């Protein structure tokens, strides 16, 4: 080997040694930096994982402007969204804990989930205490979809659960858009931010938590790593306790009840049927991520525990918690007034005149007879109800309802009926002559979908 070659090799060896020393210094510096940054400055231990950072990105992109818009719309909406933000912060803390910890016992997971239950219950309470608010649809959109938070205990497919909750929200956000599109851009932006947050959350879950909340098999003890949420939780409400038992992702309602159902453990899965658009049955009165919409609804309306209400509040007639009352009559109402019937059982409501709109929410074995409605008649989260139209109504909407009989007069045969996530629906129309019996027609519940070209073609299938 020549002297020149040896010199060249020594030069290369020296260069390699220099590079190795630089790498060693870099690593040492990085470790020190990491150690420093891991010092708890805000209650969290350890560096945040990519999933935590991405979750925060969703919050920054959608929830931050959503909060500002909520406060701008109305105090009650702002207050409710404050509780929503606290719940989201608690969920972020749980995701962070999961990224650093092994999957805990059910008892420990129960403690980790408690803040979500508490804040979700507050969201529902704010809605229930503001039923006369002009922003009731906004309050309901959040309250009825708050169950999206329970995806952290849904297995093996939490993504669809969030999609179901989004469907529940859209039942109300669509009303908001119908009323305010082109009139109030703040309302439109409010809807856009919330719905898009839920859509992006579903994508986020599919990417980072495909089969359930991802825990770190090499992590530490979840109990010791649990950070306290930035906002202290309010006094624990009388809401059902959250359960740590993972639930299947089928259809799940809202959170307070969502976690209430989860607390049943294995019993929950026996009636598995989450709430989604397809089951918006998030009957958040039955907000449980695994309970069948119909089942939960019934459970909640069976025994109203509050004082009965029958009063005109502004332009809205509120009829609530009536039991075995067959003599509820609204005589000569104003056409600008609306009628809201909530959690009534085995009762009859008569409306003698024209009103703007009618809503039955969470009622059981309740009937309503009315003459004319300018806008619509809506049935949500009900069981075994009857609607009789003696005059006219443009549309009837049925959502998350089990058992609905609709009696149409000759003047109302052009009424459009829209149904979703409902069953046992029948329409009775007059016969060919006055002496003929009513003709009963069943609203289809089963559909067949096929791909034609690049589009889906759906048609109802006849019942056997």
Curated annotation (Swiss-Prot):
Keyword Ligase among UniProt keywords: no
Keyword Lipid metabolism: no
Gene Ontology terms for molecular function: actin binding; adenylate cyclase binding
Membrane topology field: Peripheral membrane protein
Species assigned in the record: Dictyostelium discoideum
Role description: May have a regulatory bifunctional role. Binds G-actin and PIP2. Involved in microfilament reorganization near the plasma membrane in a PIP2-regulated manner.
Gene: cap
Low complexity bias locations: 224-247
Signal peptide start-end: none
Domain-related comment: The C-terminus is responsible for sequestering G-actin. The N-terminus is required for the PIP2 modulation of cap function.
Pfam families hit by this protein: CAP_C, CAP_N, CAP_N-CM
All residue ranges annotated as the C-CAP/cofactor C-like domain in the record: 304-443
Family membership noted in the UniProt record: Belongs to the CAP family.
Protein name (Swiss-Prot/TrEMBL): Adenylyl cyclase-associated protein
InterPro entries per UniProt: Adenylate_cyclase-assoc_CAP, Adenylate_cyclase-assoc_CAP_C, Adenylate_cyclase-assoc_CAP_N, C-CAP_CF_C-like, CAP/MinC_C, CAP_C_sf, CAP_CS_C, CAP_CS_N
Subcellular location: Cell membrane
């Amino acid at each position: 080997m020549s002297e020149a070659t040896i010199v060249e090799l020594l030069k290369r060896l020296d260069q390699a040694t220099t590079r190795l020393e630089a790498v060693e210094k870099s690593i040492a510096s990085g470790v020190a930096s990491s150690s420093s940054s891991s010092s708890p400055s805000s209650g969290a231990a350890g560096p945040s994982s990519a999933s935590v950072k991405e979750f925060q990105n969703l919050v920054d992109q959608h929830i931050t402007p959503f909060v500002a818009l909520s406060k701008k719309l109305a105090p009650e909406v702002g207050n409710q969204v404050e509780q929503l933000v606290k719940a989201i912060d608690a969920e972020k803390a749980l995701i962070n804990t999961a990224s650093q910890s092994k999957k805990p016992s059910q008892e420990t997971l129960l403690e980790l989930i408690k803040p979500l239950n508490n804040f979700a219950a507050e969201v529902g309470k704010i809605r229930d205490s503001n039923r006369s608010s002009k922003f009731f649809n906004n309050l309901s959109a959040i309250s009825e979809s708050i169950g999206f938070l329970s995806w952290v205990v849904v297995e093996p497919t939490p993504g669809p659960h969030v999609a179901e909750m989004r469907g529940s929200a859209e039942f109300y956000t669509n009303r908001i858009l119908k009323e305010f599109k082109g009139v109030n851009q703040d309302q439109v932006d409010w809807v856009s931010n919330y719905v898009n947050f839920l859509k992006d959350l579903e994508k986020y879950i599919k990417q980072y938590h495909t089969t359930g909340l991802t825990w770190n098999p090499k992590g530490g003890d979840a109990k010791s790593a649990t950070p306290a949420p930035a906002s202290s939780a309010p006094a624990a409400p009388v809401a059902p306790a959250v359960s740590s038992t993972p639930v299947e992702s089928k259809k799940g309602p809202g959170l307070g009840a969502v976690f209430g159902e989860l607390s049943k453990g294995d019993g929950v899965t026996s009636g598995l049927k989450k709430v989604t658009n397809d089951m918006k049955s998030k009957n958040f009165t039955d907000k449980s991520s695994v309970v069948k919409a119909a089942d939960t609804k019934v459970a909640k309306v069976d025994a109203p525990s509050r004082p009965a209400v029958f009063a005109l509040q502004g332009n809205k007639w509120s009829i609530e918690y009536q039991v075995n009352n067959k003599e509820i009559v609204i005589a000569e109402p104003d056409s600008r007034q609306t009628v809201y019937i909530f959690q009534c059982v085995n009762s009859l409501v008569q409306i003698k005149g024209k009103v703007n709109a009618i809503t039955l929410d969470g009622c059981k074995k309740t009937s309503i007879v009315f003459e004319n409605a300018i806008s619509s008649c809506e049935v949500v989260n009900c069981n075994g109800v009857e609607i009789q139209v003696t005059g006219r109504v443009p549309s009837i909407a049925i959502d998350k309802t089990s058992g609905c009989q609709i009696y149409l007069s000759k003047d109302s045969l052009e009424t459009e009926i829209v149904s979703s996530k409902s069953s046992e629906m029948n329409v009775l129309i007059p016969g060919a002559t006055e002496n003929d019996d009513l003709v009963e027609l069943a609203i289809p519940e089963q559909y067949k979908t096929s791909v034609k070209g690049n589009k889906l073609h759906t048609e109802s299938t006849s019942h056997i």
